[in-house]
Amino acid sequence: MQSLEVVEICAGAGGQALGLEKAGFSHRLAVELDVNAAATLRKNLKSDVVITGDVADPSVLNPMEHLGVSLLAGGVPCPPFSIAGKQLGADDMRDLFAWAVELCDVMKPRALMLENVRGLSMPRFAGYRQHVLDRLNDMGYVAEWRLLHASDFGVPQLRPRFVLVALQNKFAPYFTWPEPTGAAPTVGETLKDLMAADGWEGAEEWAAQANDIAPTIVGGSKKHGGADLGPTRAKRAWAELGVDAMGVADAPPQPGDKFKVGPKLTCEMVARIQGWRDGEWIFEGRKTSRYRQIGNAFPPPVAEAIGKRIRAALNMEGEGRDRAVDSDHNPLYRALKESGDFMTHRQLERAVGRPIEAYELERTISDLGRDFEVETKDGASAMAYKLGPFKAFTGQEGHLRHEMFVRHRTKIS
């Protein structure tokens, strides 16, 4: 069986890294911007494979040094697509998704795996997703998006992640998505022993109350204050589980401790809820940094499950078969792209083969206009639309992303 190597970009503190290593990949390179997260990677991986810096800087990552690597993987920044944010997509200086896709055209990895937040699956980004699929198809890859839930892989947390997997044409027939492994344990089942570790008498009763999986762990960003477990809605969900979400504790509850809501979680407890096993990963930095590293990570069990399926495909295990891939995310985008010219409402209807309500056309053009240049022309009888260039950063030297990155680097996480 061949040795499989991965180049991981925007690697964070290593949730995906650990999962991929468990799946049989070894790291050729892991790149991370945050100093503390990079220190965590060095502590747990071979230190010489970790680089700290902006992954889009050629002096940090030279794609030509990694031609034909088995897997290119990463958890590129999520704010451009976050439901909690402005969903700027290609207009967001932090958007590296399109850049990572274009990296495939240079590095020619045998497989690509990128994960992001659920927001990228929303209708707002249908054109963006379609562009990504079409570009990868042009490069010789079969690509597919899939919304996966961490709780389906034993992680005691409500954590949906939107994952893109692409494989070169000869490997694609051997890939299948991982199947759910069964129900996840509750927060109480997961943390009871840690809550009782220092002798707190209330651990048994607390565990009985914490009888569901956790809400999504939110790592947050450097722009906001100390560590806590999320916005108001999440705090209410934590309170129902008997957890005080207003901060992170330094130690488990002590004998005789009484709580109005319940105890706070420690970083070790949060790591368990994210799918880490005790002692298998050491986090560097102060408490707030460690919490953010853990909270922003891709749960290792999910990364491992996907990684094993990618490994099997690259080894051409089993019988190859044609996959039914959902490759049509935005037919209006495709019609405009294939035309390359101005199209009216009626022309678009003929192109997609169905009626298009005026509100649908208006919304789609508005959404496309946030990720692409869209020209409009008021003709004698009807408005016409023409799709222009993609706005996203794909490595262009003169792109505004470079200036904005330098200006706001300390706030990016």
From Swiss-Prot:
<dbReference type="GO" id="GO:0003886">
    <property type="term" value="F:DNA (cytosine-5-)-methyltransferase activity"/>
</dbReference>
<dbReference type="GO" id="GO:0032259">
    <property type="term" value="P:methylation"/>
</dbReference>
<keyword id="KW-0238">DNA-binding</keyword>
<dbReference type="InterPro" id="IPR031303">
    <property type="entry name" value="C5_meth_CS"/>
</dbReference>
<dbReference type="GO" id="GO:0003677">
    <property type="term" value="F:DNA binding"/>
</dbReference>
<keyword id="KW-0949">S-adenosyl-L-methionine</keyword>
<dbReference type="InterPro" id="IPR050390">
    <property type="entry name" value="C5-Methyltransferase"/>
</dbReference>
<dbReference type="InterPro" id="IPR029063">
    <property type="entry name" value="SAM-dependent_MTases_sf"/>
</dbReference>
<dbReference type="GO" id="GO:0044027">
    <property type="term" value="P:negative regulation of gene expression via chromosomal CpG island methylation"/>
</dbReference>
<comment type="similarity">
    <text>Belongs to the class I-like SAM-binding methyltransferase superfamily. C5-methyltransferase family.</text>
</comment>
<protein>
    <recommendedName>
        <fullName>Type II methyltransferase M.NaeI</fullName>
        <ecNumber>2.1.1.37</ecNumber>
    </recommendedName>
</protein>
<keyword id="KW-0808">Transferase</keyword>
<dbReference type="InterPro" id="IPR001525">
    <property type="entry name" value="C5_MeTfrase"/>
</dbReference>
<dbReference type="Pfam" id="PF00145">
    <property type="entry name" value="DNA_methylase"/>
</dbReference>
<keyword id="KW-0489">Methyltransferase</keyword>
<dbReference type="GO" id="GO:0009307">
    <property type="term" value="P:DNA restriction-modification system"/>
</dbReference>
<feature type="active site">
    <location>
        <position position="78"/>
    </location>
</feature>
<comment type="function">
    <text>A methylase that recognizes the double-stranded sequence 5'-GCCGGC-3', methylates C-? on both strands, and protects the DNA from cleavage by the NaeI endonuclease.</text>
</comment>
<dbReference type="InterPro" id="IPR018117">
    <property type="entry name" value="C5_DNA_meth_AS"/>
</dbReference>
<feature type="domain" description="SAM-dependent MTase C5-type">
    <location>
        <begin position="4"/>
        <end position="317"/>
    </location>
</feature>
<keyword id="KW-0680">Restriction system</keyword>
